[in-house]
Structure formats: C-alpha cells, structure tokens
Regions:
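Basic/aromatic-rich interaction segments and small domains that mediate binding to polyanionic partners
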Residues: 3-5, 10-23, 31-62
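Acidic, negatively charged sequence signal
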Residues: 7, 67-72
Length: 72
C-alpha cells in the first residue's frame, strides 16, 4: 500500500519494539502515521536489520510497543 502521497500522513520518528508470533522480538521504528476512513490507524513500520524496507500496516499495540523517542 502506498500511503506516502495520501493527505493526512504524519511523518514521525518513533522507536518501537516489534513482537513476533514465535515469541521473538526486534527493534524497529515508525516513520509515519495515517488513519483510514473507518478510523483504523496505520503505521509505516521498519524492523531493524530485517533487510526489508518500511511498509504500511495496521497499528497493533499488542504487537508494536512504542518506546521513548527522547529523554528519560
């Protein structure tokens, strides 16, 4: 899905922890937020060291945990 050209895309730099179904996890980042007409929130997610480019997917807070972006 190419949402980069869609109106309403908010560009961000948000560190995250991504949890996978097999119990493993990895660090990643969200570089954009977008909300569809039904109100579902989407994020542009890139998993670090995965070799895959960032992609848009529905935001699932049980799978993608937001980490502090700065300061303590």
């Amino acid at each position: 899905m190419d949402l980069d050209a869609e109106p309403g895309v908010e560009r961000v730099y948000q560190p995250v922890e991504v949890h996978f179904g097999d119990g493993t996890w990895a660090l990643g980042r969200i570089s954009g937020w977008w909300q569809d007409a039904a109100g579902r929130r989407w994020c542009r997610l890139r998993v670090a060291r995965s070799g895959r480019p960032a992609r848009w997917e529905p935001f699932d807070p049980a799978r993608v945990v937001l980490l502090p972006a700065g300061g303590v």
